[in-house]
């Protein structure tokens, strides 16, 4: 199912299911789920998912492919994911530019070293994943608090991966804001140095201000003004693309989340008027 560029969406979380099912038509343009959490789910939860995707387009954001991992990609899981995407007519599938497994699952999204070897390694695995999934995917810039090893900057690493893997970017604006603060670089310079043709979609979310120079990516609060402003800058640089509000816990009433979705739409309209 195709998404329009000015689509504004909300993350599908089980804690929000009753409210999402009762939501008025048109309140959101799409929902996003982690297929890892829904593959093989039946019963009431599975029925609820089917009811939602019958009327609202679905995108998917994976959690456990471990694109940067050292063990072989899980071919059986990738095939399960491929079938899930086909069944639910998913237009956009993304994964994290990270690793989350070694001898077992690590239950976290860990940063890769910013090295040429890591670029070659993760790019080859992205190409393999795309071939097995029979589709182009987007990778997301993750938030991180310490880099294992650096031969290059974060932006150089991201660009090298996008080029060698020939994949798209899901630009997480909150992660960019958090990383720029925590690691002392200019978020606007990061945007300028990204190739415009690679950005497929955006995420926005809330974070926690631990200290003036330390932000924690939580997805548990409202989007902060600086992140909204950075989203506007991204729209000016790359154009409006499907944009999702992520909220993973500490859920307010759905009406409050829909007000944030409406803020996405307002930023999109503002950018449209700028070109009108």
UniProtKB/Swiss-Prot annotation:
Transmembrane segments: none annotated. Coiled coil: none annotated. Signal peptide: none annotated. It comes from the Bacteria. Belongs to the UPF0276 family. PANTHER family: UPF0276 PROTEIN HI_1600 (PTHR42194:SF1). NCBIfam families: PRK05409.1 (NF003818). This is UPF0276 protein PA4106. It comes from Pseudomonas aeruginosa (strain ATCC 15692 / DSM 22644 / CIP 104116 / JCM 14847 / LMG 12228 / 1C / PRS 101 / PAO1). The lineage of its organism: Bacteria, Pseudomonadati, Pseudomonadota, Gammaproteobacteria, Pseudomonadales.
């Amino acid at each position: 199912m195709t998404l329009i560029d000015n689509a504004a969406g909300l993350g599908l979380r089980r804690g929000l299911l009753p409210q999402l099912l009762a939501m008025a038509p048109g309140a959101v343009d799409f929902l996003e789920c982690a297929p890892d959490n829904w593959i093989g789910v039946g019963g009431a939860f599975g029925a609820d998912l089917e009811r939602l995707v019958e009327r609202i387009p679905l995108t998917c954001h994976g959690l456990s492919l471990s694109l940067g991992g050292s063990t072989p990609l899980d071919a059986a899981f990738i095939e399960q994911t491929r079938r899930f995407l086909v069944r639910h007519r998913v237009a956009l599938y993304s994964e994290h530019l990270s690793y989350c497994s070694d001898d077992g699952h690590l239950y976290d999204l860990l940063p890769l070293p910013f090295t040429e070897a890591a670029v070659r390694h993760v790019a080859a695995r992205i190409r393999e994943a795309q071939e097995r999934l029979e589709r182009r995917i987007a990778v997301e810039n993750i938030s991180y608090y310490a880099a294992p090893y650096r031969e290059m900057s974060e932006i150089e690493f991201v660009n090298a991966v996008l080029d060698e893997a020939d994949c798209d970017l899901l630009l997480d604006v909150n992660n960019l804001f958090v990383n720029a603060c925590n690691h002392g670089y200019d978020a606007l310079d990061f945007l300028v140095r990204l190739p415009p043709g690679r950005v497929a979609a955006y995420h926005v979310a809330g974070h926690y201000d631990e200290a003036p120079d330390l932000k924690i990516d939580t997805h548990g609060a409202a989007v902060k003004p600086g992140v909204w402003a950075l989203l506007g800058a991204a729209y000016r640089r790359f154009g409006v693309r499907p944009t999702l509000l992520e909220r993973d816990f500490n859920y307010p009433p759905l009406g409050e989340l829909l007000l944030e979705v409406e803020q996405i739409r307002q930023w999109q309209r503002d950018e449209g008027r700028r070109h009108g």
